[in-house]
Amino acid sequence: MAIKKFKAYTNGRRNMSSLDYQANLTGHAPEKSLLVALPTKAGRNNQGKITTRHQGGRLKRFYRIIDFKRQKDGIPATVKTIEYDPNRSANISLVVYRDGEKRYILSPKGIKIGQVILSGDNVDIQVGNHLPLANIPEGTFVHNIELQPRQGGIIARSAGSSAQILGKDESGRYVILRLKSGEVRKVLAINRATVGEVGNEEHSLVNIGKAGRNRLRGIRPTVRGSAMNPNDHPHGGGEGRQPIGRKSPMTPWGKRALGVKTRATKKASNQFIIRRRKETK
């Protein structure tokens, strides 16, 4: 998808860019049977307390029900549209099965309108087809990867993401994947994945340009702790611009912010990670 840049009529538009949706999307209205109302939470829980800061005030939107499981085996589906989804970075495609059922799927890179895709154990290695990892050859890029059988895709679902199949382990029970982050991990060979990469890979190149666009997305300003009062943040207070006055930076709740491991050391999935993503940097 091409990047569209704007003339510098104002300072906000000087470096702003966006994706050229008209050149790549079909422009159809979303399928009403696959829409669900999406209430706004503004980062609050059921008590009205803020649990996630810097959220609120976004545009209203509907949630598109996405089929991450792809369990209609052996029934051909025809790609009808490539649409914009406000709830994710990737585009989505409306597919119509031969029995008449309509579903949304993540739109893979290179998929075409009118293309026929399949799900099943022994389908062809073609972009958009969904099959077990054990039946996909080495070197193939896949997305929408399951972590548990029939759970639905969990890994590699955002725009431009994918994982490469490196091979199988000695037992043949697991398939070894290399993720975009550089992490190498094992996944059960009976888990399914979709062949190809997720489309809309230029999403990461977009420059927001001005604060107003982030407000429409529901992202509120992030205020520095040192600019607050001492009753609002451990870094706050002082006459003018002062150091934080502590040995290490703190979170708003008084915990150390840097150098603390955020992943559980005894997490069960550690046994499946062959190489951590940080070891590749």
From Swiss-Prot:
Q: Give the span(s) annotated as Disordered.
A: 222-281
Q: Which UniProt keywords apply?
A: Ribonucleoprotein, Ribosomal protein, RNA-binding, rRNA-binding
For this entry, list what GO says about its biological process.
cytoplasmic translation
Entries under Gene3D superfamilies matching the protein:
2.30.30.30, Nucleic acid-binding proteins, Ribosomal protein L2, domain 3
Q: Name one GO cellular component term.
A: large ribosomal subunit
Cross-referenced Pfam families:
Ribosomal_L2, Ribosomal_L2_C
* Superkingdom field: Bacteria
Task: State a single Gene Ontology molecular function.
Answer: rRNA binding
Record carries keyword Transmembrane helix: no
PROSITE patterns, from UniProt?
RIBOSOMAL_L2
Does the record's keyword annotation contain rRNA-binding? yes
Database matches in PANTHER family? LARGE RIBOSOMAL SUBUNIT PROTEIN UL2M (PTHR13691:SF5), RIBOSOMAL PROTEIN L2 (PTHR13691)
The record describes its quaternary structure and partners as: Part of the 50S ribosomal subunit. Forms a bridge to the 30S subunit in the 70S ribosome.
Quote the function comment for this protein.
One of the primary rRNA binding proteins. Required for association of the 30S and 50S subunits to form the 70S ribosome, for tRNA binding and peptide bond formation. It has been suggested to have peptidyltransferase activity; this is somewhat controversial. Makes several contacts with the 16S rRNA in the 70S ribosome.
Q: Which family does it belong to?
A: Belongs to the universal ribosomal protein uL2 family.
What is the protein's given name? Answer: Large ribosomal subunit protein uL2
Q: Which organism is it from?
A: Metamycoplasma hominis (strain ATCC 23114 / DSM 25592 / NBRC 14850 / NCTC 10111 / PG21)
Query: What gene does this protein come from?
Result: rplB
